[in-house]
Amino acid sequence: MMQQQRLKQQQQQALMQQSLYHPGLLAPPQIEPILSGNLPPGFDSSTCRSVYVGNIHPQVTEPLLQEVFASTGPLEGCKLIRKDKSSYGFVDYFDRRSAALAIVTLNGRHLFGQPIKVNWAYASAQREDTSNHYNIFVGDLSPEVTDATLFACFSVYTSCSDARVMWDQKTGRSRGFGFVSFRNQQEAQSAINDLNGKWLGSRQIRCNWAAKGAGAVGEQNSDAKSVVELTSGTSDDGQEKVVNEDAPENNPQYTTVYVGNLAPEVTSVDLHRHFHALGAGVIEDVRIQRDKGFGFVRYSSHAEAARAIQLGNARLLFGKPVKCSWGSKPTPPGSSSNPLPPPAIGQIPGLSAMDLAAYQRQLALAKMAGAQAFMQPQGQRIGAPGQGIYDGGYGGIASTQPPMYF
């Protein structure tokens, strides 16, 4: 009996040891991490002995960080750069193998309930300055898509200079969109035209021009400029100046979708039906300014609103492609209301019987959580150069209705 237990323990240890390595790729003496982070194109890690650590909880101290990373090998140095919301740091090893082992085993490890990001550290000069490059937005990314995957997809265009997936700082998961930079404007436009609606991973991606400043992925952070910068596939920590945490796309208090370019005949009921059919989440309120051609749809959560923006942007409503972005004001805590009841299915002006039947089928599938399968046909994804995905909506709207936070 004891011998069986000992054999079982040895098997479990062997399985744990195997999990440290990329399956079927490298033997233990050649351990190499899976490069899923945001490294410069052509980055060579063969001589690296330092790792970047991002998304560090504010309660983590430098001695604790040193203790955690010493588990994979002796350290030459350890530096923690403190920030109010999340810190970052750099760990230097005496040998490359220990650094590689740290990336494989410690990336995603929770410290005080917050997953840390670990990847190779590199000099700022190794990354090309993309501040004057042409940036495109790539939405509806599947969870498995990394910076490396995104760059590989767009690198068929020779002027592609950088690619970054936006990650949730608290969960460590992809937020479902990213940005790609190009040196040549025409190639950026070609990428939008050619790859919009194409499959990447398990989803069809949506491509459009990024809002001005949103895709400035090449900007450097002053704290890390002279040493190393972000390499973990996020735009937080070492890139805090690139992604503003108060911006609507990063602030969980923003739950309202601005909907522009509405046809004059669109009513609040029509708008409700349109967004309910997307199946993005629970709708709490719908408002419309018919004389100005725009409206607002408030969801119960930030994630649902983001999903609605991705699914709804450029979809046709009464023959016009609507423009979806974030509302300009956050929803104050405690102001959420009960979900709106599902809209009644009735005859929709401007639609043929065939269109209405298709809408009803789409609505039924949305209720079964199948709305993700509904993507507008390629020809209906209308996006003009310069059209931003997140442009903040409009404020200062006079209304006699109860206050809704746009």
Swiss-Prot record:
Localisation: Nucleus
Gene3D superfamilies according to UniProt: 3.30.70.330
PROSITE patterns associated with the record: RRM
Residue ranges of the TM segments: none
GO biological process: mRNA processing
Cellular component terms per the entry's GO annotation: cytosol; nucleus
MF terms (GO), sorted A to Z: mRNA binding
Pfam family for this entry, one: RRM_1
Region named Disordered: 231-250
Domain RRM: 49-123, 134-212, 255-329
Keywords: mRNA processing, Nucleus, Repeat, RNA-binding
Stored InterPro entries: Nucleotide-bd_a/b_plait_sf, RBD_domain_sf, RBM42_RBP45_47-like, RRM_dom, RRM_dom_euk
Function noted in UniProt: Heterogeneous nuclear ribonucleoprotein (hnRNP)-like protein that acts as a component of the pre-mRNA processing machinery. Functions to facilitate the nuclear maturation of plant pre-mRNAs. Binds with high affinity to RNA molecules that contain AU-rich regions. May bind to the 3'-UTR and protects the mRNA against exonucleolytic degradation. Associates with nuclear poly(A)+ RNA in nucleus in vivo. Does not stimulate transcription or the 3' end cleavage/polyadenylation reaction.
Name of the protein in question: Oligouridylate-binding protein 1
Organism of derivation: Nicotiana plumbaginifolia
